[in-house]
Amino acid sequence: MFRRLGQDFQLRKVKKILKQINALKGKMSSLSDQELVAKTVEFRQRLSEGESLDDILVEAFAVVREADKRILGMFPYDVQVMGAIVMHYGNVAEMNTGEGKTLTATMPVYLNAFSGEGVMVVTPNEYLSKRDAEEMGQVYRFLGLTIGVPFTEDPKKEMKAEEKKLIYASDIIYTTNSNLGFDYLNDNLASNEEGKFLRPFNYVIIDEIDDILLDSAQTPLIIAGSPRVQSNYYAIIDTLVTTLVEGEDYIFKEEKEEVWLTTKGAKSAENFLGIDNLYKEEHASFARHLVYAIRAHKLFTKDKDYIIRGNEMVLVDKGTGRLMEMTKLQGGLHQAIEAKEHVKLSPETRAMASITYQSLFKMFNKISGMTGTGKVAEKEFIETYNMSVVRIPTNRPRQRIDYPDNLYITLPEKVYASLEYIKQYHAKGNPLLVFVGSVEMSQLYSSLLFREGIAHNVLNANNAAREAQIISESGQMGAVTVATSMAGRGTDIKLGKGVAELGGLIVIGTERMESQRIDLQIRGRSGRQGDPGMSKFFVSLEDDVIKKFGPSWVHKKYKDYQVQDMTQPEVLKGRKYRKLVEKAQHASDSAGRSARRQTLEYAESMNIQRDIVYKERNRLIDGSRDLEDVVVDIIERYTEEVAADHYASRELLFHFIVTNISFHVKEVPDYIDVTDKTAVRSFMKQVIDKELSEKKELLNQHDLYEQFLRLSLLKAIDDNWVEQVDYLQQLSMAIGGQSASQKNPIVEYYQEAYAGFEAMKEQIHADMVRNLLMGLVEVTPKGEIVTHFP
């Protein structure tokens, strides 16, 4: 409805619908509870008679608005209704912090639940999902809808498939992005219909949609499978990397996060390792480890990208500052960072299944979402998801004052100036929320505040468990909170008594972040619902975003500069410096968009392959195919292919048969002419028919033959798909590390990925036959099948 329309025109269309909804206020308030609830049945009936969701939007929104008032004591404001309209039409509603996004969602959720195909509300964490489901669930249940939350009370307890099936059959499901992703992957690993629990994806509302679809877009969800043989190269390669010289032995493009070896670097590596050619096939593992080790040293910084906890390395989410406890970098990069830090190496595992959030949410018929910072990324939302971003007016005029940045040459000057600013406002009693870019900087500010005798809280990846409590206290008079960018999205900061009179909450940013959206989120922590407040950023030429994306003269300026008097830090003024910061952040945002676009391009090949594999699995599971017919087709094709191979002797044919078709063949009869493919095929089919007949006779007594066929075929698909997923991840890493080559990496990746997929299909058919014929089966006294596949 709003695709590519201007903001004013979008709002005019929304306000036209709002006017119709407001006209029904009196009518809805006059209905009894029973009459209001009966509207749900009426709406479903109208849909079944041919009306569309759009046809009943006005009346449905008026109904749930009235229900919100009766059950929750909150009547959605006009601006909340406007946000709800935007989301129903599959777009992003940009609503400021404190504008009531949770209540806004009740309207499109209620309306879209009538389809009977399910509505999902996705939040960034389990706490928010449970909280919102409990609060808003009162409204939905009052109106006759069912609601499900796919979490157990005990995190260690695994929910059974039948339990999840009931939950996902609800009209409305509240979940998290990661939980939904892993449920999708696990659903497609089921070996029978009873193990599946998801229905097709219909409509989703994503809370903090930019965080999930943009900031987390490049982190794939992975279900780890069998461990690899652990490489012992990590330590020696890490030592090698410390001897290499940047610019001579390898090239590092920081803004693109690319590294590659030079000819000199390859020679240095060969001398160190005592090999003749690093790029020979037998030395490919050395080359791969070397690229990972350089990336580990140049692209990953301790206490910013990861922390060390005891003898363990844990990744940190750049966008939120939260620990990514269950996430491991793939392909050996994780172990390369561990080797760099000299901590225990975690086991290398193959990925059984993998998907990105981009790919996951594109499966929904309709996506919508809400955030406080979507407009600056509207172009990317349109290009990637075909969603417009509509900025919803605030219910009350914003009173927060956003002051211009203070820019300094060096980091120490900036830290000193920001500390003086903190002391100034702390003395007045204002609560202060100080945002930093890393765990390391949070520790620095904490030690400085401690030295000044200022009591404070620290919120970083090391103590995220206290996030809600710390954030809830940060609006009280005199409170000082030092936080990484994680601080409490989804949790309002309410001002304590007397704080508004002092000017409200003061937000201080101690550096510009890599994305303008994160800076806007930081500012947005202050000034909720018309509260007073202010924000200000302190920036230096040594900050990461400027070092990484600023012009070359910047580096020389802060290197040559000598601080004369730390207590009199020099503020850089003028358009040149103001533009410098803006351009650096713009370049950073652009690099982020490019990286996400590249991730999407790489993922497209995986998506196509995954879709084919999962559809084939489902056809074997759901009973839509006669499995005996499938087996006949597979064996016909297989015997035709393998019989066409040239067998130079009876011994070679015998060896092939006993390793691929049957253990029970003692010899190849003399009358078989091994050079006659028709005779060879006929003999193979005799052996195959005998093997299958014996299994069928045994298993049919217990009605288990079809189950055996299904398990044999699925095992072949799953084993090979695990190898293919792992191969595609290795391939993307390898091609991504060859940036110096003249080839288009995406084209090269697609070609190699397609060739790998074709080879996988051939191997699947061969393994299906081996499983069917050489799998050992037995039936337990309880009538259950036990299989041992080759």
UniProtKB/Swiss-Prot annotation:
Which subcellular locations apply to this protein? Cell membrane; Cytoplasm
A GO BP annotation: intracellular protein transmembrane transport
**Phenotypic consequence of gene deletion:** A single gene deletion has about 60% decreased biofilm formation, 75% decreased adherence to human lung pneumocytes. Has higher pneumolysin (ply) i.e. hemolytic activity in the cytoplasm but less in the cell wall. Decreased levels of a number of cell wall and secreted proteins. Deletion of 15 genes (from psrP, SP_1772 to SP_1756, includes the accessory Sec export proteins SecA2 and SecY2) and infection of female BALB/cJ mice, shows the psrP-secY2A2 region is required for lung infection and for infection to progress to blood. Mice infected intraperitoneally showed wild-type infection.
Query: An example Gene Ontology cellular component term from the record?
Result: cell envelope Sec protein transport complex
Q: How does it sit in the membrane?
A: Peripheral membrane protein
Gene3D superfamilies annotated for this entry?
Helical scaffold and wing domains of SecA (1.10.3060.10), P-loop containing nucleotide triphosphate hydrolases (3.40.50.300), SecA, preprotein cross-linking domain (3.90.1440.10)
Q: Which InterPro entries match?
A: Helicase_ATP-bd, Helicase_C-like, P-loop_NTPase, SecA, SecA2, SecA_DEAD, SecA_motor_DEAD, SecA_preprotein_X-link_dom
User: What top-level branch of life does the organism fall under?
Assistant: Bacteria
Q: Which residues bind ATP?
A: 80, 98-102, 492
Q: Which GO terms of the molecular function aspect are on file?
A: ATP binding; protein-exporting ATPase activity
Remaining remarks: Encoded in RD10, a pathogenicity island with an atypical GC content that is associated with invasive pneumococcal disease. Pathogenicity islands account for greater than half the genomic diversity observed between isolates. The main function of this island seems to be correct synthesis and export of pneumococcal serine-rich repeat protein PsrP.
Q: State the family named in the UniProt similarity comment for this chain.
A: Belongs to the SecA family.
Job of this protein: Part of the Sec protein translocase complex. Interacts with the SecYEG preprotein conducting channel. Has a central role in coupling the hydrolysis of ATP to the transfer of proteins into and across the cell membrane, serving as an ATP-driven molecular motor driving the stepwise translocation of polypeptide chains across the membrane. Plays a role in export of a number of proteins from the cell including glycosylated PsrP and pneumolysin (ply).
On subunit structure and binding partners, the annotation says:
Monomer and homodimer. Part of the essential Sec protein translocation apparatus which comprises SecA, SecYEG and auxiliary proteins SecDF. Other proteins may also be involved.
What name does UniProt use for this protein? Protein translocase subunit SecA 2
